[in-house]
Amino acid sequence: MYSAIRSLPLDGGHVGGDYHGPLDGTNLPGDACLVLTTDPKPRLRWTTELHERFVDAVTQLGGPDKATPKTIMRTMGVKGLTLYHLKSHLQKFRLGRQAGKESTENSKDASCVGESQDTGSSSTSSMRMAQQEQNEGYQVTEALRAQMEVQRRLHDQLEVQRRLQLRIEAQGKYLQSILEKACKAFDEQAATFAGLEAAREELSELAIKVSNSSQGTSVPYFDATKMMMMPSLSELAVAIDNKNNITTNCSVESSLTSITHGSSISAASMKKRQRGDNLGVGYESGWIMPSSTIG
């Protein structure tokens, strides 16, 4: 009678399986590869050699997914193996392969994720560095632009100040020329006014002198040439006597002479009278003319 035997593990160790063999734990008479345990219920022991033959058969059949227990049993050619042993061991082998594949894939995924994370972190760090450099470059550009703008405004202010200074200097020169002309004209007017003032003072002094001379004496001022034309007192006395004599003679002769001699006497008397008249006129003119020159 046979007992149940577990199959060997998938890593090449002993995999147990159900097997009905002799109770004393001896090997099966059909194949020396089969080994039974010495337990009260003997089981088939999957030795390393038996597991390698199983793996070779599965590989020859195209892998654990394509191999079946029946084809594996024919390929292995081991007597004493049953479909039950192969089915259980194939199932465990598939599970082990799948777990190993999943672990491999997981490890690959983990490595890929790590690599991607490393790549992502490196790319992120590189992007951050690039962005930081770009920001620094932008800040430098903005600083240079602001500095250029400040320099331009400063240059404009200096230009405005220079033009304003030129205008102030030109206006100062213009005002200075106007002041010089005004001072020159004022000096000329002052000189003219000084001359007029001097002339006015001279006229005032002359008027004062004339007024003082006219009020300080009662004798009128006569011209020397006119004073020479006036007759003396003796001349006036002689002229008066001559006039009286001529008048007396004329009256006596008029009474003594005849009518025939009247014309001659009249002529002579007229001549004498004319002479006396001339003397009288000269006397009067000589006396009156000085009176007309009183100033």
UniProtKB/Swiss-Prot annotation:
Single GO molecular function: sequence-specific DNA binding
What is annotated about its quaternary structure and interactions?
Homo- and heterodimers. Interacts with PHL3, but not with PHR1.
Any Gene Ontology biological process = positive regulation of gene expression
- Supply the PROSITE patterns for this chain: HTH_MYB (PS51294)
Composition-biased stretches (Basic and acidic residues): 99-108
Q: Does the keyword DNA-binding apply?
A: yes
The disulfide bridges present are none
Q: Where is the composition biased (Polar residues)?
A: 127-138
Family assignment from sequence similarity: Belongs to the MYB-CC family.
What is the name of the protein in this document? Answer: Protein PHR1-LIKE 2
Which segments carry the region annotation Disordered? 96-138
- Induction text: Up-regulated in roots by low Pi.
Which keywords describe this protein according to UniProt?
Coiled coil, DNA-binding, Nucleus, Transcription, Transcription regulation
One GO CC term on file: nucleus
Keyword Ubl conjugation carried by entry: no
Role according to the record? Transcriptional activator. Acts redundantly with PHR1 as a key component of the central regulatory system controlling transcriptional responses to Pi starvation. Binds in a sequence-specific manner to phosphate starvation-regulated promoters.
Give the species.
Arabidopsis thaliana
